[in-house]
Amino acid sequence: ADMAAAGFADIMDGRMTPAQAGCFLMGLRMKGETPLEMAHAVGIALGRANRVEGLEGDCIDVVGTGGDGRNSFNCSTATALTLAGMGYRVVKHGNRAVSSSCGSADALEGLGFPLDVAPEDVRRLLDERNFAFLFAPNFHPSFRNVGPIRRELGIRTLFNLLGPLINPARPTHILLGVARPELVELLAETLRQSHIRKAAVV
């Protein structure tokens, strides 16, 4: 797990070439990521994120791993907006589509939601409308080294699994959808080692 953590940090900090990063990610995928490796990666990513401060009380993220390869409906975004309309405080963290036709950012942008929300805007948005969307590239500058590699590989990697776990607002609750049943235990065990108070992995 320590070697995997060091490799992940090297990718995040741009110390690996694209070829090296691709081999590392493929190796982890073939071996199978462990909850401890995932927990280390979560900590490394959150440590490099633009953190959201000053949130009080409970809030939830509704998010999915994506990558099911079926061009399926983005139900996490619809669910998040429904919960916000019901009065729950939703701080959704997401990105544009990588392996599908519509990621959460694409859907919300199409509905007129801004993608340029800054860390200091999140509390106000939650107070005003119970909903804030954190566009991942604005909060994870170190991920700029990762996007081209993910697109070139074109398959699920550690980063598909990691994205839903690294909300810089550090919500107290999470509803996490997975693309395949075999991912449920891995992500549930990873969340057990995180800051999340309550989680449902479906």
Question: How would you name each of these model-derived features?
Answer:
Residues Q20-A21, V91-H93, V201:
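Short beta-strand segments at enzyme active-site cores
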Residues L55-V63, V91-A97, F159-L162:
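Core alpha/beta catalytic barrel or barrel-like domain that forms the active/cofactor pocket
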Residues D2-A5, R15-G22, G32-A39, F73, ...:
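Electropositive phosphate-/nucleotide-binding environments in soluble metabolic enzymes
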Residues L28, L83, L191:
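Hydrophobic pocket-lining residues that define ligand/cofactor binding sites across diverse proteins
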Residues A1-N71, M86:
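Acidic, glycine/proline-rich low-complexity segments that act as flexible tails and inter-domain linkers
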Residues G43, G47-V52, S72, G87, ...:
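Glycine-rich anion-binding loops and their surrounding alpha/beta cores
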Residues G64, D68-L125:
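A generic, well-ordered mixed alpha/beta core segment in the N-terminal half of proteins
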Residues R29, N95-R96, P171-L175:
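Conserved short-loop catalytic and cofactor-binding motifs
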